[in-house]
C-alpha cells in the first residue's frame, strides 16, 4: 500500500489532528519469549506506518513517536503499569503487537477525562492492507451497529454447530457493543481491522445472581484452534470439562486448571467485514461474517469476569466445526436467525 493510500485510511479511521501526539507501539521478544518471522514483519510494518504518520504529521501538525515494550507472552494478559503510564499522554495509540494488550490498553480510554483513543492491532499482517483494512468502513459501521442492537434486544443465543453440538448462551442483563472502525474521538477504543458486533454473556456474578439467577449458558463448545478439534462441556457460563482423553485434551485441562477464571465464556461476537478473509489469523478471522466465542476476561467488554487472558475461538466456513445456525431469542419471544447455513445474513442487517 502506497503512502497516500495509507494516509487516506489514517484520515478516515483515526483522523489525527493538529497539536496531537500519535504513538505507534510494538512489543518485542525477550528472554524465553522468542521472535518469529511474522513478528519481525509486523515490526517492519509498524515502522512503515510510523513513517507514513510522520509524513502526514508534517502537513497536519501532529507529532509522532515510536515505542517498544517487552512482550507479555499471553494474549490479553496485563501490560505493566509503568508501561501504561509512559504512553498515557498520547492522543492516538496504534498498537501493532504480537500479544494483544487490549484489556489493559482500553483502561487508558476509559479513564475519566481521557484524551486517548486507541487502535489495537494484535498479530496484524501487511497483507491485510489489501483485505480487511481496505474495507468500506461506512458499510462496516452500519452492519456492526445493526448487530449491536440485535444483541442488546436478545435474551439468549441458540447455536447449532456442524459437529451436531449445540450451545445456548445467556445474554440477559447485558448490552451489545460494536467495533465499527471509528477511532477519531477521544476515549474510543477499536480492534483494527474492525468489523464486529459483540456482547459479554451473563455470568451470574455475585452482585446480580440474586435478581437474575444463575447463568443459563450451557452446552458443548467446539474449539478449532489447537491443530485438532477439541470440545468443551459448558455449564452456568463456565467450561467445566474438556471432553476426551487425548494428549491435547489433557493439555487443555491443565491450561484451564492454572486459573479458574479462564473457564468463563467471555464473548459472543459476530464478524461483519465483507473484505475480511480466513487465514488462521484471529485478528482478521473474527471479522469474517460469522461467529466467534471467547473465554477468559469479559470485564472490559461489559461483563463481570477479570482473568489473565482473553482467547477467541472462530468458526469460519471450512473448519472442522462450523456454525450451521445462530438464532437470537428476543425479550419479546420473537426469534432472529442471524447465521444460516454457516453464513451471516447481511441482508437483514
What do the predicted segments below correspond to?
Residues 278, 284-348:
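Internal helix-turn-beta structural module
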Residues 241-304:
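Dual-mode signal for accessory low-complexity, basic/Gly-rich regions
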Amino acid at each position: 500500500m502506497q503512502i497516500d493510500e495509507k494516509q487516506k485510511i489514517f484520515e478516515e479511521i483515526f483522523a489525527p489532528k493538529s497539536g496531537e501526539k500519535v504513538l505507534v507501539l510494538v512489543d518485542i521478544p525477550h528472554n524465553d519469549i522468542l521472535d518469529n518471522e511474522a513478528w519481525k514483519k509486523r515490526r517492519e510494518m509498524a515502522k512503515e506506518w510510523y513513517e507514513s504518520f510522520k509524513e502526514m504529521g508534517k502537513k497536519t501538525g501532529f507529532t509522532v513517536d515510536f515505542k517498544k515494550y517487552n512482550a507479555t507472552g499471553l494474549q490479553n494478559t496485563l501490560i505493566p503499569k509503568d508501561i501504561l503510564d509512559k504512553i498515557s499522554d498520547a492522543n492516538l495509540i496504534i498498537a501493532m503487537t504480537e500479544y494483544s494488550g487490549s484489556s489493559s490498553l482500553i483502561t487508558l480510554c476509559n479513564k475519566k477525562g481521557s484524551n486517548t483513543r486507541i487502535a489495537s492491532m494484535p498479530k496484524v499482517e501487511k497483507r491485510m492492507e489489501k483485505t480487511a483494512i481496505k474495507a468500506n468502513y461506512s458499510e462496516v459501521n452500519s452492519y456492526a451497529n445493526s448487530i449491536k442492537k440485535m444483541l442488546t434486544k436478545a435474551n439468549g443465543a441458540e447455536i447449532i454447530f456442524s459437529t451436531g453440538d449445540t450451545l445456548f448462551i445467556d445474554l440477559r442483563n447485558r448490552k451489545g457493543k460494536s467495533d465499527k472502525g471509528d477511532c477519531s474521538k477521544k476515549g474510543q477504543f477499536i480492534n483494527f481491522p474492525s468489523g464486529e458486533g459483540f456482547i459479554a454473556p451473563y455470568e451470574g456474578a455475585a452482585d446480580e445472581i440474586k435478581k437474575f439467577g444463575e447463568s443459563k449458558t450451557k452446552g458443548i463448545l467446539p474449539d478449532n484452534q489447537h491443530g485438532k478439534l477439541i470440545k468443551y462441556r459448558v455449564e452456568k457460563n463456565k467450561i467445566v470439562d474438556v471432553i476426551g482423553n487425548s494428549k491435547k485434551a489433557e493439555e487443555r485441562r491443565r491450561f484451564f486448571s492454572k486459573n479458574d477464571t479462564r473457564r468463563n465464556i467471555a464473548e459472543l461476537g459476530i464478524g461483519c467485514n465483507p473484505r475480511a478473509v480466513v487465514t488462521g489469523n484471529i485478528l482478521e478471522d473474527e471479522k469474517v461474517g460469522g461467529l466467534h466465542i471467547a473465554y477468559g476476561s469479559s470485564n472490559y467488554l461489559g461483563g463481570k469476569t477479570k482473568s489473565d487472558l482473553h482467547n477467541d475461538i472462530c468458526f469460519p466456513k471450512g473448519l472442522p466445526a462450523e456454525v450451521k445456525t445462530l438464532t437470537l431469542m428476543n425479550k419479546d419471544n420473537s426469534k432472529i436467525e442471524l447465521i444460516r447455513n454457516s453464513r451471516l445474513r447481511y441482508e437483514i442487517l
